[in-house]
Every structure is written in structure tokens, then in C-alpha cells.
Curated annotation (Swiss-Prot):
Residues 1-37 are annotated as: Disordered. This is Protein EARLY-RESPONSIVE TO DEHYDRATION 7, chloroplastic. The keyword Chloroplast applies. Keywords: Chloroplast, Plastid, Transit peptide. Induction: Diurnally oscillating levels. Induced by abscisic acid (ABA). Regulated indirectly by CAMTA1, probably via a DREB/ERF pathway. Accumulates during dehydration stress. The lineage of its organism: Eukaryota, Viridiplantae, Streptophyta, Embryophyta, Tracheophyta. Pfam families: Senescence. One of its GO terms (cellular component) is plasma membrane.
Length: 452
């Protein structure tokens, strides 16, 4: 028979000592070691009524979605010219890359780059044209002239020529790359105002070698070296200079149609495939002579130098926006950034749907660039890869002087984390876009158009 003491220790209930009723109850006493109910500290409960969620507390609410850069197409053997009727200057030679910047689930911007030297955005109000199997040209409005830029002061136009178009002529050594050109044209259809315009057969026959497309078409990227490269480059320069009046005329008319929302361009209405005889004579003469450095310098018109400066600004602007997005400086969500929504951007912005390119207009791209530049004008750094010596060797001192003006054509990168941090402070990610702001801007735009 068990003793009464054994019954007490095996009891399910704690033993209460009644010998001293005024003594405090000790919750940690040995009598409660077998208690089925857990002990609770009321102080802990009071302090942790709303515990933090560890999986979300470390992420700030205003953090922008991650941005990534994707190379969706790469074509070797690309030569890029600045189309000019006095002398088309070669800007870059190397690989053509089409780069897509994605932030979250949205395609924020699509950029074209040649040899990592010249970049420009592909946008829905930018004209891209296929002329033949190896030649394409792109039309861009140059960025807003900056009043404090020394190159503007030397221009003497006070920024009045900011609406003058930049026309880039792209030549591709297309032998063996025909399938890549098909992909390129699909991308241009998706992200720009793409059309196909051809030179008339009469002009091709009269132009002899100057408009001959077989030189580039029958050259592969591997063969684009040495003497063969010089032949192709000379032919490309003559080709684009000969077609310059046609390209400039078409670009001006096409830009007006795109700005008014006229949609796709109809072949034959704007493009004049016939090349004037004086242009053909000039082009054929150019093909027959080899220009020395001094002769090249004499061919560069002062207006061409101004356009070269605008090319540099276009590259700077494109890299500024791209690096700002990738650095988390610029958060894009929904349709547009607030810097775009708060300006008079025009009705074409508001016809876009979610999922399309957010920076779908070059106007929008320019305004985003302005916001980035204001925030980080004094902290951004420049990295140069195109040297004055190279340009001086190819095009003479005047072109080299233009290349040395302002920021270099090849470099405008943020580069360091502290720079990105400073600009992130200046542009508040919380105020990226308010739907009410977008709606009010759309209403004001529609009202102004109705009054007009």
C-alpha cells in the first residue's frame, strides 16, 4: 500500500501550502513542475500584442521593384553613321545590341546600342525605316539643349534648333545574318514606328556603285577587317550622304504624322525613292576618291559638328535613364513616372495600355532624363571610351573638337552606390505616380485640344 506522500507527488494538481496563507505563491516552485498548463508572463503579452512579421519587416514599403537589363538581340558587323547631306560621319562600328530594361513585370525601356559607344531609345514616336537588306535609318528628336553647356554657347543658336532631327544610318554586314535581321525587324515593329521604304530602281541604275547594296550584303562580320572594312565604310558613307536629302525630308514629314497620332505610315506618300542627279553624281565621285585626313576635315560642315554634339547628348540621356532605373533611382509603376505625368505629354501617352513599353514616347524619355539630371547633375561621373585622338585620326581636328565638347558620346554612367543613394534621396519613390495626376493631365490635354 502506497503512502500518502506518494499520492501527493503524483497528483495532477499542484499542492497548496496552507500553513502560511499570507506567503506569496511562487510559480517556479517544484510543486508546479508537473502542471499541465503552461505558465504565462503577462509582461511579455503586453509588449508583444502586435508582433512584427520577420518576412516583411526588413523590406521598406517604398523600395522600387528590381530592374534588370536584357540583351534580346545581338548582331555583329554593324556600322552607324550620322546622316548628313554634306558628309555622313561614322559614329561607331561593332556589335548592334537591342537592350530591354525590365522593372518588375513591366518593360520600362528598349535601347539600341552600337559597339557600346552610341545608344538611343527605341520608342513609339521614333521613326525606324528599312531601306534595303542591309540599310536602316532611325530618326530622333535631340534632347533639350542645356543652357549652361559650353557647346550650346558656341553653337550661337541659343537652343533654337532643338527640333532639328538626328538621323542615324545603320549598315549591317548581313552575309550569314539574314535570320537575325528578321528578328530585328520584329523588334522594331513592336517598339518603334517601323516602315519599309525602298530606293527606286531608276535611282539604283543611275547611281551605279554609290547605291549598290551588294557590298554590305555580301560581306560577313568576320570579313569586316582590313582593306575590306575600308571599302565597306567608304561605300556606307557615300550611300547615306547621297540619300541624306531623301531621309531628312521623309523624317520631317513622318515626325509630324506620328505626333498627330496618324498611326502607321503609308508607303509612297512620304518617301521619294528617286534620288536627284546631282546627289548621284556627288556620290559616285566620292566613291572614286580616297579622302585624306585634311580632306575629311574640310567635308565636315559646322552644322554637322552641332549634330555630333546632339548625338553625345542623346547617348548621355539614354545611359542616364538606363543606369538610373537599374540603380533603383527611378521607380516606374503602372503607366508612367510622375515626372512624365505632370507635364504636357500629349494624347498619345494616354492611349497606351498596361504591359506596353512604359516610356513609349521620346518626349517621356526626355522628361525622365531631365528629372534624373536635375537630381544628380553635380554627383554623376563621366567615363570616356571614345577618345579625341581616334576621332582626330578619322575625321580631322574639327570633329575631334566636337567630340571633346561637353560629355563624351560613349560615357555617362552612375557607377557608384553612393551616387545612386544621393539621387534616390532626391527622387522620392513614394511619389512615383498618382492615378489622379494622370487623369487630370489627360483631361487638361483633351480640353486644350478641343479648344484648339
Amino acid at each position: 500500500m502506497e503512502s500518502s506522500g506518494d499520492k501527493q507527488t503524483s497528483s495532477l494538481y499542484p499542492t497548496v501550502d496552507t500553513s502560511n496563507p499570507e506567503a506569496p505563491i511562487n510559480p517556479s516552485s517544484s510543486s508546479s513542475t508537473n502542471n499541465l498548463y503552461p505558465s504565462l508572463d503577462m509582461n511579455d503579452l503586453a509588449r508583444n500584442l502586435f508582433p512584427e512579421q520577420p518576412e516583411t519587416s526588413s523590406i521598406p514599403v517604398s523600395a522600387p521593384p528590381a530592374a534588370t537589363e536584357e540583351v534580346i538581340l545581338k548582331i555583329s558587323g554593324a556600322i552607324l553613321h550620322l546622316i548628313d547631306k554634306s558628309y555622313s560621319v561614322e559614329l561607331a562600328c561593332g556589335d548592334l545590341e537591342i537592350i530591354r530594361i525590365v522593372q518588375g513585370e513591366n518593360v520600362v525601356a528598349v535601347l539600341a546600342s552600337v559597339s557600346d559607344e552610341i545608344q538611343w531609345p527605341l520608342t513609339k514616336d521614333e521613326n525606324s525605316v528599312k531601306v534595303d537588306e542591309s540599310h536602316y535609318f532611325f530618326t530622333l528628336r535631340p534632347t533639350k539643349e542645356i543652357s549652361h553647356d559650353s557647346s550650346d554657347e558656341e553653337d550661337g543658336d541659343g537652343g533654337k534648333n532643338t527640333n532639328e532631327m538626328l538621323n542615324y544610318g545603320l549598315t549591317i554586314a548581313s552575309k550569314g545574318q539574314e535570320h537575325l535581321l528578321v528578328e530585328l525587324e520584329k523588334i522594331l515593329e513592336d517598339y518603334s514606328s517601323f516602315s519599309v521604304q525602298e530606293v527606286s530602281e531608276e535611282a539604283k541604275e543611275a547611281g551605279e556603285k554609290v547605291l549598290d547594296v551588294t557590298v554590305a550584303r555580301e560581306t560577313s562580320p568576320v570579313e569586316l577587317t582590313g582593306e575590306r572594312k575600308e571599302i565597306v565604310e567608304r561605300q556606307c558613307s557615300a550611300y547615306w550622304t547621297t540619300l541624306a536629302p531623301n531621309v531628312e525630308d521623309y523624317s520631317g514629314k513622318a515626325a509630324k504624322l506620328i505626333a498627330t497620332g496618324s498611326g502607321h505610315l503609308i508607303k509612297g506618300i512620304l518617301w521619294c525613292g528617286d534620288v536627284t542627279m546631282d546627289r548621284l553624281i556627288w556620290g559616285n565621285g566620292f566613291m572614286k576618291r580616297r579622302l585624306s585626313k585634311a580632306e575629311k576635315e574640310s567635308e565636315v560642315h559646322p552644322d554637322t559638328l552641332k549634330r555630333i554634339r546632339r548625338v553625345k547628348r542623346m547617348t548621355k540621356m539614354t545611359e542616364s535613364v538606363a543606369n538610373s532605373i537599374l540603380s533603383g533611382v527611378l521607380k516606374v509603376s503602372g503607366f508612367f513616372t510622375s515626372s512624365v505625368a505632370n507635364t504636357k505629354v500629349g494624347k498619345k501617352f494616354f492611349s497606351l495600355l498596361p504591359g506596353e513599353v512604359i516610356l513609349a514616347s521620346l518626349d517621356g524619355f526626355n522628361k525622365v532624363c531631365d528629372a534624373v539630371e536635375v537630381a544628380g547633375r553635380n554627383v554623376m561621373s563621366t567615363s570616356s571610351t571614345v577618345t579625341t585622338e581616334l576621332v582626330d585620326h578619322k575625321y580631322g581636328g574639327k570633329a575631334a573638337e566636337a567630340t571633346n565638347e561637353g560629355l563624351d558620346a560613349a560615357g555617362y554612367a552612375l557607377g557608384t552606390a553612393w551616387v545612386a543613394f544621393k539621387i534616390r534621396k532626391a527622387i522620392n519613390p513614394k511619389s512615383v505616380l498618382k492615378p489622379s495626376t494622370l487623369a487630370k493631365t489627360a483631361i487638361r490635354s483633351a480640353a486644350s485640344q478641343k479648344k484648339a
